[in-house]
Structures are given as C-alpha cells and as structure tokens.
C-alpha cells in the first residue's frame, strides 16, 4: 500500500487535475476543423497525375541570388533557371498536394484524397528530402517543402469530416516522415548567430510548428515557439527587422515575406494556450503595421535601407496571406480590414493552401 504524506497530497492532487492539461494534445486553430464544403459523389473530371519522382539526392542547389553582393538582392536569371529546374519535382509535390487537398476539402471527391495520399506516401516511403549533404539553398527547400506539406496535412487530419479515418496506416507512415524532416529541420536551423537569423529561420520554425501539431510533438512545438521569440525580439521599436533591411532594394519585400511564418506560429501557439502577441511589446503587430504602411508609402523603408524599394512583390495579393492569421490575432478594423477583404481569398501553398477558408470562412459571402 502506498502511503501519501498529508503535506504532499494537495500537490499531487493538483498535478492530477492540471498536469494533464499542461500536456494536452496539440491542436490547430479552429478553422482547421472545417468539414468538406459540398460533398460530390462522382470524381468529375479529376485525374490523378503520376507522383513526381521522390527527391532523394543531394540538397545542393544554386541560389537565385548567386553572384550577388552581401545584400543578396540582385536576381541571377541563369542561376534561378537552374534552381527551378533542379527543384521542379519538389515544388510540383508542394503545389500539387496543396491543390488536391484544397479540391478535396471543397468537393470531397475520394479520388482527390487518394491522389494526395499516393503522392505523399510515395515520397515518405522513399524517405525523400532527408539528405545530409546540403547547402543553404538545399536546407531552405527542405523546410519550405515541409511547411507546405504539413500545412496541407493539418486540413485533412483535423477536419470534422475525418478523411484520414480509413487511411490510418498511410497516414502514420506519412506523419513519421514529416517528423523525421522536422527533426532534421531543427538541426539545420538551430544555433545560428543572431546576425544570421532572418526570414529563413522563421519559415523553418513555421514548418516545425505545423509538423508539431500534425504529429503531436511537444518538443517540436517548443522549438518553434523559441525561434518565434528570437524573431520577435529582432523587431526594433520602429517595426524594422535589421537583418531584412540588409536586403537593400528588397528590404520591404523581405519584411513582408517574414510575416507569414511568424503570424502562423503565433496563431498556432495561441490555439494551444501560448499567447505570443505581446512578445517584445507587440512586435508582430508592429511589424505588420510597418509593412502595410510601407506598401502605401515606402519612403521609410527607402530611408532605412538606403535605396529605392522594389515594389513588385508588394503588388501581388497572395503575398499578404499573413493578414488572415494576423487579423485573427489582432482583430483588424478599418482600412486594414478593408484591404484584407479586397485581396481575399488568400491561397498560399507554403502555408498549406487556402488560409482564408481556415481563418475567415465567411469571406465569400461578404463580397
């Protein structure tokens, strides 16, 4: 018989009552529980293309900024072409899975789900993207692909329609592969000096966060939160990221590019009882407001970066997909809310697809 000291009994009771809550299963934001929009029984004109060849080779790719100076802001057309060619199968997988999952969540056609599972299963069985021979561009592709795949997977895993219920063996194999990729991503992006931590680290943290929730891995969740805090504390009082200001004419574009992963991480953290909104005096809010102001009038970015800004990316609506999680965190009003509505829907394969359906499912009815 176990004897419990009266002094320790209350503590043990508290642990029993609240300890489980502290380690509750990880969950995504509420929108990921949405079911299939309108179930269609036939396969329609959907045809499953053959899965792209699993990429198991060396992750050494040319950078599209090859030959550029330290600012890494001048595009090398020949290098970009070589990069696109060598990473084509990876990008085809990312975009294809995102598209098929989106189609399935809209129409519920079994062939759409089966095809997405076939593609992911083919790569999982090959243990693709796990090469230990990589350069910076290669490890960047690994984490981008993981974020795309895990982000899409969350819509299947948590949907009230339970599409994976009849595919548990396949799902387990795919999720184990995601977990291996996430563990490697943690190794790839850990321990960097502050001057080397920029948007790449934030995107790595997003991929790990998405995988943490998909696989219920608290260690991965904690790492993503830790990396988020590093990023948030890089935002200065005026809302600038010093390491992105180094990108010269693309400083504003890279500030904008840093926002999607940070906003998604904060949103996922909040869903699990970790409120990151106030980190570094509301850094994420400050960063977003600065980018929105810069998109209207880039003069402050021009002054801080020391060169006129390239606004090409700032004219593409999908580049503002971060507004969905950001507005869910900070409750946008007025001009910001109007701008968000004007640009919806937001579809970003690197965030797992249609983020408007996740965060603002009634958006279409507002138009």
UniProtKB/Swiss-Prot annotation:
Record-level Gene Ontology MF annotations: poly(beta-D-mannuronate) lyase activity
Gene Ontology biological-process annotations: alginic acid catabolic process
Alphabetized UniProt keyword annotations: Lyase, Periplasm, Signal
Binding site residues for substrate: 63-64, 136-137, 254
EC number: 4.2.2.3
Any one of the GO CC terms: periplasmic space
Enzyme class: lyase
Leader sequence segment: 1-24
Catalytic activity as recorded in UniProt: Eliminative cleavage of alginate to give oligosaccharides with 4-deoxy-alpha-L-erythro-hex-4-enuronosyl groups at their non-reducing ends and beta-D-mannuronate at their reducing end
Pfam family of the protein (one): Alginate_lyase
CDD domains, alphabetized: AlgLyase
Family: Belongs to the polysaccharide lyase 5 family.
Function comment: Catalyzes the depolymerization of alginate by cleaving the beta-1,4 glycosidic bond between two adjacent sugar residues via a beta-elimination mechanism. May serve to degrade mislocalized alginate that is trapped in the periplasmic space.
Name of this protein: Alginate lyase
Organism: Pseudomonas entomophila (strain L48)
